[in-house]
Regions:
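Conserved helicase motor "Helicase C" RecA-like lobe of SF1/SF2 P-loop NTPases
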Residues: 546-575
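Conserved RecA-like P-loop NTPase helicase motor core
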Residues: 502-519, 572-698
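SF2 helicase catalytic motif II
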Residues: 241-269, 273
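Conserved pre-motif I regulatory segment
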Residues: 1-41, 51-54
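A contiguous, basic/glycine-rich beta-loop/short-helix subdomain that forms a polymer-engagement track
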Residues: 194-219, 230-239, 352-506, 522, ...
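Acidic, Ser/Pro/Thr-rich low-complexity regulatory regions
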Residues: 741-899
């Protein structure tokens, strides 16, 4: 570990940080010390997450130390020097003094897009000097509820049943939270991610969901998904306190869209009809005394049900009155019309609280009905409870003025669907129904409500935020600190080419008017076929959209190009469903890492799962091909209205983008994000190939990430491209492919696992290790969690390592010096369940037979596909009998595991 002092704050870092990491941490500290907001861009692979965590927690640690000194000074004063406040403070218990509300210590809130990204950040935290800090993560009941009878339930029904059981104290797991929250077995775990708290919950029989809410009260840093912060309804439900908090939005390139969507909603005529039928059915049940319906506790009466039904009937009538223009484009109304619409139905700013309260009581009651037509229902009523809360987020004239500026109500005809098998007695689908889209076009609308909570600082950070000015203008946040960092890699590690024509000289242009051109599609396919012959290992190909990707796939299969490409590299296509996606990703990694093959191709779409959240370091992504610019659908009503909104804003404030500038930037940002899947650390290298002539436009080039702009080169013909790529990969392999990672003072890659050596047909490349068990590689939300690369062996030997490229004494001593318990835990964490069972069986057989040859043969079988974990084998020496130690040592030396 190394300690650097920046802006008066000592920061313990796993290695000597690079200059760009120091600059990044200085900007973070500037935000925290000056209580201002920051927008910080640093490319993927520059150690952004590590720098963010270390600088933030170092600042918090200093605040803690200062507070501790102040307490000691208070304790040393004589009686006459105490004020009444000091006496009061002195009488507080240690627990009270440590509470964040009493201590005045700010809480760090770290939010990212997905739980897999949060999990990666928490694993990063565990490997720092700040692993003694208290950290927890907030998740949904789907992730954290372990009650057996609700195990198979999801979504709204699970939430309702949980709330009911808590209310009636019929959940034995919830009832133990209060008792167990101060248990040393719980409080003794500093960093608790979702897996940790679920395991502890199962062990100690408490509810992980409610325990997480308790733990956040004392946590130094709380991890949570974006929507927990940006959705006002969820934020209130989760009781997230933002006063004096430091809020970090990592991977914030999507924050504008998320803010808009959190403040938007949709109402269908069929939703209103279903709500009417839900209320009607309850009224009928209450009138039927034979069902003993009145025996159940209720917080509503028949008159209230009648009033609620009348509201929905009136709302249905008012929606039906809205006239639609002829054609599919629909009708656009001012945003404030939503207040008029609900007002005519009887819900206003003055009474909406009572309406939402009534709906909540009804929904809660329906949760108690476990059988019959009401079981598991009330979903539409619950939806309207949330809708009304969003509509009436504010009630002042100023709020309505903002709605008038930032919102539009777009109404279209509802598609008539076949009636599904439903619990309701009558058909809900009807002709002439409408869809009301209440769209927010200002990210600042939601962000302002967040900022109004009194937070200390807001830090937005990502690898792709630029240009910063329009982002800041749209979010309407006062930003005091800005940063656009360069990349950590050199020009020899990146080859960026714009390709305007294929090998047959056919122009490559995936514009709306050319994407159906068979000549273009064929030329694109031939371009990819040729490139697979010079690009080693893993190749990513991103298309602007699913339809375009499927169109290309279909044509290439018909003309034989698909089979030709597949003969070079196995092709995998990004599916839309979770299970198929996980399977495709697992197979792709296996093919890339198979030394008998030439690699693999993964075809995906910009803004898809692959382009947003995954790490294709080293051989997993030696090149990325972008086949076109992913512009939003030009004729989409929401896109049209967004462009108009921005044009109006730009007319009065030039800091705002014009509509067409935003439209272009949407495509460029998606491309930048897709490109960020490769070049993941300081020793990585790869090619970025832009196969669309439009990339040669100066405006588009100017919207690419800062670290790419000066590296972009246009190649006039395909032959020159092939020659340049051969030379690039040959030189990069010589300079970086077999790089030995020994302990040194140089800074390693901050974010990902150490790669193993991959030997292909022509090259000897580095490729990141992939766990053989899909259960370790796949996250619950459909994202693939690539195991993050630990600090390479530049770190001190005391740092836990999963793999070393060149085994060395320091690493082996680290394994050998562990206790028996620690060693077994280390092996269990590294191996999948099946391999660990085989491992323990091999030890048992050796213990029973004393045959060391059988032991080494078993180890060879277990670790054959896990060569990156063979460093664990020498740790078995303490288990080997004295008479076998020499033979075991020889085995380790022969396999390069001991010097």
């Amino acid at each position: 570990m190394t300690t650097v002092t920046l802006r008066g704050v000592p920061i313990t870092f796993p290695f000597e940080p690079y200059d760009i990491q120091k600059e990044y941490m200085e900007k973070v500290l500037e935000c925290l010390q000056n209580q201002t907001n920051g927008v910080l861009e640093s490319p993927t692979g520059t150690g952004k997450t590590l720098s963010l965590l270390c600088s933030t927690l170092a600042w918090l640690q200093l605040k803690k130390d200062q507070l501790r000194v102040q307490r000691q000074m208070v304790g040393n004063l004589n009686e006459n020097e105490f004020t009444a406040e000091f006496w009061k403070a002195k009488d507080l218990t240690e627990k009270q003094m440590n509470s964040r509300s009493m201590s005045g210590l700010p809480t760090i809130i770290y939010a990212s897009r997905t739980h897999s990204q949060l999990s990666q950040a928490m694993q990063e935290l565990k490997r720092t000097a700040y692993s003694n800090m208290k950290a927890c993560v907030l998740g949904s009941r789907d992730q954290l509820c372990t009650l057996p009878e609700l195990a198979k339930e999801t979504g709204t029904y699970k939430n309702q049943m949980c709330q009911l059981k808590v209310l009636t104290r019929s959940c034995h797991l919830y009832n133990r939270v209060e008792k167990k929250k101060d248990d040393p077995d719980i409080t003794g775990v500093n960093i608790m991610d979702i897996e940790d708290i679920v395991k502890l919950g199962n062990l100690h029989k408490f509810c992980p969901f409610y325990m997480a809410k308790e733990l956040k009260q004392q946590a130094d840093i709380v991890f949570m998904p974006y929507n927990y912060l940006l959705d006002p309804v969820i934020r209130k439900v989760m009781a997230i306190q933002l006063s004096d908090a430091v809020v970090i939005l990592d991977e914030a390139h999507n924050v504008e869209k998320i803010c808009e969507e959190s403040a938007s909603l949709q109402i269908k005529s069929s939703d209103v009809t279903l709500a009417i039928e839900e209320v009607t059915a309850i009224m009928k049940m209450m009138a039927n005394e034979s069902l003993s319906f009145d025996d159940s506790p209720k917080d509503f009466d028949p008159d209230q049900l009648c009033n609620l039904k009348q509201f929905f009937l009136d709302l249905e009538k008012e929606i039906d009155k809205i006239e639609l223009k002829s054609g599919p484009e629909g009708t656009t109304l001012e945003g404030t019309y939503i207040f008029e619409l609900f007002g005519k139905a009887g819900v206003t700013a003055e009474n909406f609280y009572s309406v939402t309260g009534l709906i909540a009581n009804i929904v809660q009651f329906l949760s108690t009905v476990s059988e019959g037509p009401f079981a598991r229902k009330g979903n539409n009523l619950r939806m309207f409870e949330d809708i009304i809360k969003v509509i009436f987020l504010g009630t002042s004239d100023e709020f309505r003025q903002k709605v008038n500026k930032c919102y539009k109500l777009h109404v279209t005809e509802e598609e008539v669907k076949k009636r599904r098998s439903d619990w309701l007695s009558k058909a809900t689908a009807k002709s002439g129904g409408k869809v009301l889209n209440y769209w927010c076009f200002s990210p600042g609308f939601g962000m302002n409500m967040l900022m109004a909570s009194g937070m200390r600082s807001l830090i937005l950070t990502s690898g792709t935020l630029a240009p910063l000015k329009p982002l800041i203008s749209e979010l309407e946040v006062n930003v005091g600190v800005r940063l656009e960092n360069p990349h950590i890699v050199t020009d020899d590690q990146v080859c960026v080419k714009i390709v305007t024509a294929g090998p047959d000289s056919e122009p490559l242009n995936c514009s709306y008017y050319n994407r159906e051109n068979i000549k273009y599609i064929s030329s694109l396919g031939r371009s990819i076929l040729n490139l697979t012959r010079v690009i080693p290992n893993g190749l990513l190909i991103f298309f602007p959209s699913y339809p375009i990707m499927l169109k290309c796939q279909q044509h290439w299969q018909e003309c034989g190009l698909w089979s030709d490409i597949n003969a070079q590299k196995a092709i995998y296509v990004e599916p839309r469903d979770k299970d198929s996606f996980n399977s495709a990703m697992t197979n792709y990694y296996e093919k890339v890492n198979d030394p008998n093959l030439k690699g693999a191709i993964f075809m995906g779409v910009c803004r898809g799962k692959v382009s947003e959240g995954l790490d294709f370091a080293d051989a997993n992504g030696r090149a990325v091909i972008i086949t076109g610019l992913p512009y939003p659908p030009l004729k989409d009503p929401r896109v049209i209205l967004k462009k108009r909104y921005l044009d109006v804003c730009n007319a009065t404030d030039r800091e705002f983008l014009r509509g067409d500038e935003w439209y272009s930037l949407e495509a460029s940002r998606a491309v930048n994000q897709a490109i960020g899947r490769v070049i993941r650390h300081k020793d990585d290298y790869g090619a970025i190939l832009l196969l669309d002539a439009r990339f040669n436009n100066a405006k588009i080039k100017g919207q690419m990430s800062l670290w790419l702009r000066n590296r972009i080169k246009h190649v006039p013909n395909f032959g020159e491209l092939m020659r340049d790529l051969r030379m690039f990969f040959k030189k990069a392999d010589a300079d970086f492919g077999s790089l030995q990672r020994r302990p040194s003072s140089a800074a390693p890659s901050a974010e990902f696992e150490v790669p193993k050596t991959y030997k292909g047909d022509k090259f000897n490349f580095s490729t990141s290790s992939i766990a053989s068990s899909s259960s370790e590689s796949l996250s619950n939300n459909g994202e693939v969690t690539i195991h993050k690369r630990l600090q390479p062996s530049h770190q001190h030997a005391s740092k836990r390592m999963k793999i070393n490229l060149i085994p060395n004494v320091a690493t082996h001593s680290n394994v050998n010096n562990t206790t028996t318990k620690e060693y077994i835990i280390m092996v269990k964490k590294s191996l999948d369940e099946s391999s660990f069972k085989n491992f323990t069986l091999a030890l048992k057989v050796y213990k029973d037979t004393g045959n060391v040859t059988t032991l080494t043969e078993s180890l060879e079988t277990i670790f054959r596909s896990k060569s990156h974990l063979k460093y664990l084998i020498p740790g078995l020496e303490s288990y080997v009998k004295v008479q076998h130690k020499a033979e075991f040592s020889d085995y380790c030396k022969q396999n390069g595991l001991l010097d």
